[in-house]
Amino acid sequence: MQLNELNCVILCGGKSSRMGQDKSKLILKNQNLTQFQVDKFSKIFKNVYVSAKEDKFENHFSLIKDSLEFEVYSPMLALYSILSNFKNEFVFVLSVDSPKVGENELLKMLPFLEQNYKIIIAKTPLHKHPLCGFYHSSLAQTCKNFLEKNEQKIGLLFSEIKTKFVEFEDEDAFLNLNFYEEYEKFKSKLK
């Protein structure tokens, strides 16, 4: 299996409460963070989609909207909505605010898709990264079951589903732009 046979979905539906503004629209290199991620991953994957609660991008991207079945704002709902759009395949899911993840990290995770796992995510010494990994579309119903019990954390899947945590030493590769200062620092290094 090759990366260019797979689909990628960039999650853009977070509340961005710590950032104080919508992270998906932060500007990097004369484009918003969403466009930055879509451009990068379009060179790697078969298709790149954007996941959000509504179309805040004026039809600029292939959009997967959150299901209206549940009136919550959560990563589990986004994952359920994403996986419901695919049949019998792995999908790479990444948060829009992780701009340093790239092909090297993906290639290290890729071989585990051929093994008996349904979830393959990145893990660094300090964190598991549930919004940086491959999820099999067959998990949509499991996500729905959690939502019906009002369970919103993606990490709950790991105890029920065969999951591979792919070890990475470099925390920096999985930088999340949660605060404006982190964004400013990252932006200044791009110049």
Curated annotation (Swiss-Prot):
Record keyword Nucleus present: no
Listed EC numbers: 2.7.7.77
SUPFAM superfamilies listed in its UniProt record: Nucleotide-diphospho-sugar transferases
Gene3D superfamilies reported for this sequence: Spore Coat Polysaccharide Biosynthesis Protein SpsA, Chain A
Signal sequence extent: none
PANTHER family linked: MOLYBDENUM COFACTOR GUANYLYLTRANSFERASE
Subunit structure: Monomer.
UniProt name for this protein: Molybdenum cofactor guanylyltransferase
